[in-house]
Amino acid sequence: MARRAAAGLLRRHLGPLAAGETLQARGMYPKQYGAANHAFSRFYSIQGQQRSLYGFRTNVETDDTQQSARMNFEVQKRSFSSAAAHVQRNPAYSVLNSDDVSYFKSILGDSGVVQDEDRVSVANMDWMGKYKGSSQLLLLPKSTAEVSKILSYCNSRRLAVVPQGGNTGLVGGSVPVYDEVIISLGGMDKIITFDNVNGILTCEAGCVLENLSSYVENKGFIMPLDLGAKGSCHIGGNISTNAGGLRFIRYGSLHGSVLGLEVVLADGTVLDMLTTLRKDNTGYDLKHLFIGSEGSLGIVTKIAILTPAKLPSTNVAFLSCNDYISCQKLLLAARRSLGEILSAFEFMDRHCINLAMKYLEGVHNPLPVSPFNFYVLIETTGSDESYDKAKLEAFLLRSMEDGLVADGVIAQDISQASNFWRIREGISEASVKVGAVYKYDLSIPVEKLYDIVEEMRSRVGDMGQVLGYGHLGDGNLHLNILSTKYSDKMLAQIEPFVYEWTSKQRGSISAEHGLGLMKAEKIHYSKSSEAVQLMASIKKLLDPNSILNPYKVLPQSVL
């Protein structure tokens, strides 16, 4: 019975395109979606198309004297998670004076030294409005040499600094805590070289990820990472936080994709590790110290990164499951059946879908007939459309027969695929519209991943709503607790329980967002005291005056 029903579903909903007809012939280009066609055709692949991600994006207006960000949507409520442990300003740091400003103007010019209160205020606050510093100075270097001179001077004066990219982080890592000098890398946005044979991109740290994606796609390649914030985040910030994102399951972490770095150390020394070699087994591979160190060991100024080939066939499926065990089994089945073409495996619970439908404009539920407990978004990319399509259809047929999938849709065209991704990527945006959001980014063994969501619902009760979603393919849970307003009572129900529970599972309290200010004092939940002490030793060696991004990453007690 199950096989007949599934086969019937395949026959009824196979894509309606005529033989030889392409999406291009219908005018369905990635940036020309037109009106959404809601008659979803199931089990159909998208030929030669790459999805376009939705997420938090900023418009950046730049001239000789200005570089500022304006959010495309208005964040009316604050987002809270883990009230950062209060830290005292380090009295060893100097206070900025007029002589300092004069020196910076001598190397950057007047346009590169920003003291305007409104413009500095934008750089002082994270995009969620949660963390706000009191810096009086924003510097806009345009070269590695200028960054080197800035750090050399600040180190000699013991002026603390905070490097800043697109400022899209969630843990307070890219904004000042007190009066640190802000060094924006946005003016360093040049593409240096691209190796068309090997797909190796060399660029400056201030390049916006989306711009790099467009550049390499025109060359027949893609960036190995893709984020909802790609319209505003910088590649240097991605490297410094070891950003994960939606392609992690296919291409792995940046530790595997980054071939070389140029980094400016605290004393102004330029550390040239900008190799483009795939193999180099000469001594310690120092670049890995700076990937994920959040600007606390040095400021990344240039990057050489390996970009995978852009594949012509893309499929996006939106599936429903009755329980979390089915999601786990579906992941295992996808890895076995889809193998090399599996490029994303995202999951969302029904609370996420309900929230997205309520607060996101222009999205439509692909499976509106019956509510389900869990939803899975699967993306495949490959080089042979007919092969990929047949492989995906066979996988879905078996999954329905085995009872792993309750219902499912595969996008017929790019607008439908974009709708699927808009739902997944828009959950964070929708969450903010409720009120206070307590956000946690956890790495947990897949079999235990949803247990913390259920435990949190029991603890929170009717005080708030708990959402669970994330990158199931790599065990990364985004746990969001929503409430109409922030309260100490709610926070007490969440913390330290969420960290203690994660630690007991030998998980990580930060899967991809970093530690920043928010979790610096909580690193012991994921790292041993010996490991933390070794990290502190490295920090003291490379930054003895501790001027680089202070109060972040490591507890103040070990420095």
Swiss-Prot record:
Similarity comment text for this entry: Belongs to the FAD-binding oxidoreductase/transferase type 4 family.
Cofactor dependence: FAD
Lineage of the species this protein comes from: Eukaryota, Viridiplantae, Streptophyta, Embryophyta, Tracheophyta
Cofactor, free-text remark: Binds 1 FAD per monomer.
Main location: mitochondrion
Complex formation: Homodimer.
Domain FAD-binding PCMH-type: 131-310
Function: Catalyzes the oxidation of D-2-hydroxyglutarate to alpha-ketoglutarate.
GO terms classed as biological process: alternative respiration; photorespiration
GO cellular component, one term: mitochondrion
Lineage top rank: taxon: Eukaryota
UniProt-annotated location(s): Mitochondrion
Annotated InterPro entries: FAD-bd_oxidored_4_C, FAD-bd_PCMH, FAD-bd_PCMH-like_sf, FAD-bd_PCMH_sub1, FAD-bd_PCMH_sub2, FAD-linked_Oxase-like_C, FAD-oxidored/transferase_4, Oxid_FAD_bind_N
Entry protein name: Probable D-2-hydroxyglutarate dehydrogenase, mitochondrial
Top-level EC class as recorded in UniProt: oxidoreductase
EC identifiers of the protein: 1.1.99.39
One Pfam family this sequence matches: FAD-oxidase_C
Annotated transit peptide: 1-80
GO molecular function: (R)-2-hydroxyglutarate dehydrogenase activity; 2-hydroxyglutarate dehydrogenase activity; FAD binding
Catalytic reactions on record: (R)-2-hydroxyglutarate + A = 2-oxoglutarate + AH2
Transmembrane segments: none
Keyword terms of this UniProt record: FAD, Flavoprotein, Mitochondrion, Oxidoreductase, Transit peptide
